[in-house]
């Protein structure tokens, strides 16, 4: 396990690999970071918290900050794409990803992390914002099966990974079931990604680990230990897509850094947003 970014953050989250770079955010600091393979780094600061980011087909990065979606073309060119008007002040945005059609799926979480006031939402290609799931406390990791027939989803306090049937054309989910219960592991599931074999990689917040889960056998088949207990998210990247980039939170001398680990499987490319 290698520490690749030595600037200590408060809550690094939401890593993506796009444009041959690693992007990630520091949620409470309102920072978007870009780290290239040669170590070159730049950052953009927003006046409010940021939570997720995704690349877009027209170039640049879409960032969820406050109650809006922003397009970052470069560090000096930022514009508001969409603002959620009827915002529930009990919540904030959390993890989000785009599906293969380019829709932006974004979850919300209860600010007190206690009550099921959050949900899962979709910003469609026609810029309509809709709710697809209610009664969520801390909406977190999202990943689609390789055939796009299923959505895997985390509501962290449940300590479970859920599986939904996914309709790619309509952008709808149905038939929720529990894929796996992780209650025997320390911590709660947080961010999540999928590899080229269709298995999930899940960050354990408070558990100091990333778990690899076989979705067919519904069991953990690998565990990567980290020096920091609060592991927040994970993504594949690098020139061969076989490097796992892992973000952590600052509650420990080794927390609040970004780590990497070469693994024996490749990831899949991040879907790009369609707006």
Curated annotation (Swiss-Prot):
Domain of life of the organism encoding this protein: Archaea
One term of GO molecular function: calcium ion binding
InterPro entries: 6-blade_b-propeller_TolB-like, SGL, SMP-30
GO biological process, one term: L-ascorbic acid biosynthetic process
SUPFAM superfamilies from the UniProt entry: Calcium-dependent phosphotriesterase
Any matching Pfam family: SGL
Protein family according to the UniProt entry: Belongs to the SMP-30/CGR1 family.
Name under which the protein is recorded: Uncharacterized protein Saci_1674
């Amino acid at each position: 396990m290698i520490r690749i970014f030595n600037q200590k953050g408060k809550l690094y989250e939401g890593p993506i690999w796009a444009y041959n770079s690693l992007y990630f955010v520091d949620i409470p600091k309102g920072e978007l970071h870009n780290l290239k393979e040669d170590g070159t780094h730049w950052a953009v600061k927003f006046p409010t918290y940021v939570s997720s980011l995704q690349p877009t087909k027209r170039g640049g990065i879409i960032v969820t900050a406050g109650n809006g979606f922003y397009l970052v073309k470069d560090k000096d060119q930022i514009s508001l794409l969409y603002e959620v008007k009827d915002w529930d002040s009990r919540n904030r945005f959390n993890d989000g990803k785009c599906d293969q059609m380019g829709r932006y799926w974004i979850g919300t979480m209860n600010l007190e992390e206690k009550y099921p006031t959050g949900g899962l939402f979709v910003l469609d290609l026609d810029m309509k914002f809709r709710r697809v799931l209610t009664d969520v406390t801390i909406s977190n990791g999202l990943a689609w099966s390789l055939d796009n027939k299923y959505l895997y989803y985390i509501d962290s306090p449940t300590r479970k990974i859920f599986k939904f049937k996914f309709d790619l054309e309509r952008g709808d989910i149905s038939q929720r079931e529990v894929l796996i219960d992780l209650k025997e592991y320390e911590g709660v599931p947080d961010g999540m990604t999928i590899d080229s074999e269709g298995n999930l990689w899940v960050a354990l917040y408070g558990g100091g680990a990333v778990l690899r889960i076989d979705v067919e056998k519904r069991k953990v088949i690998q565990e990567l230990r980290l020096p920091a207990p609060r592991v927040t998210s994970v993504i594949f990247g690098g020139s061969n897509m076989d490097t796992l980039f892992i973000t952590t939170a600052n509650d420990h001398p080794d927390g609040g850094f970004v780590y990497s680990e070469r693994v024996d499987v490749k990831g899949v490319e991040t879907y790009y947003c369609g707006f």
